[in-house]
């Protein structure tokens, strides 16, 4: 499923467009029936952990961490600040991906590099409103903004975690 925001403003407008583009291309390319995409998530504190959670409804959030019954997940995590240039805002956004490589039918070997390069090529074909800055691998590195999360997962052979950090440019549209 592709979980998209109903009411979009600011960075969420650009995230939603990129989310739809990536989700549609990933699902179509690999014929995935169990891939979940989420828009911007929140860094919510649960016990002593910082957990990525997607807003569902008033006071209700859905944890978006790995579910081993799925082919994979992706979600968007924004930096805690945006640079401003008049009405233009520039913000770093991490797109976090986890793929269950054993569930992907095209994988005869560990195709982690192939998956990263395909998604990187999608990003480079996308709008000029974003620019890829970095690709990060390794469970601890990917979930570095989420304190304690990596301790509960193993960076096992079947799962590939990576994030793409992109700079998104958007305009402040009057919301009043």
Protein language model annotation of sequence segments:
Residues 1-85:
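Small/polar-rich, solvent-exposed N-terminal microdomains that initiate assembly or binding
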Residues 85-103, 157-172:
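Oligomerization/assembly interface segments of phage tail-like spikes and tubes
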Residues 14, 18-27, 93, 112-122:
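Extended low-complexity, serine/threonine- and proline-enriched intrinsically disordered segments
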Residues 102-115:
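Short histidine-centered catalytic/ligand-binding loop motif
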Residues 34, 39, 112-169:
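Acidic-leaning, charged glycine-interspersed low-complexity segments
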Residues 7, 174-176:
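C-terminal interaction module
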């Amino acid at each position: 499923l592709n979980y998209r925001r109903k009411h979009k403003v600011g960075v969420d407008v650009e995230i939603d467009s990129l989310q739809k583009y990536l989700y549609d291309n990933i699902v179509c390319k690999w014929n995935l029936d169990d891939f979940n995409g989420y828009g911007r998530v929140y860094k919510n504190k649960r016990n002593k952990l910082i957990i990525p959670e997607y807003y569902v409804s008033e006071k209700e959030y859905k944890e978006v961490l790995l579910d081993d019954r799925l082919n994979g997940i992706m979600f968007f995590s924004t930096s805690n600040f945006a640079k401003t240039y008049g009405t233009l805002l520039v913000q770093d956004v991490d797109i976090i991906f986890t793929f269950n490589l054993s569930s992907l039918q095209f994988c005869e070997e560990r195709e982690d590099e192939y998956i990263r390069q395909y998604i990187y090529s999608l990003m480079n074909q996308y709008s000029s409103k974003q620019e890829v800055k970095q690709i990060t691998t390794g469970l601890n590195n990917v979930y570095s903004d989420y304190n304690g999360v990596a301790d509960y997962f193993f960076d096992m052979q079947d799962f590939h975690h990576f994030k793409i950090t992109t700079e998104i440019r958007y305009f402040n549209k009057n919301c009043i």
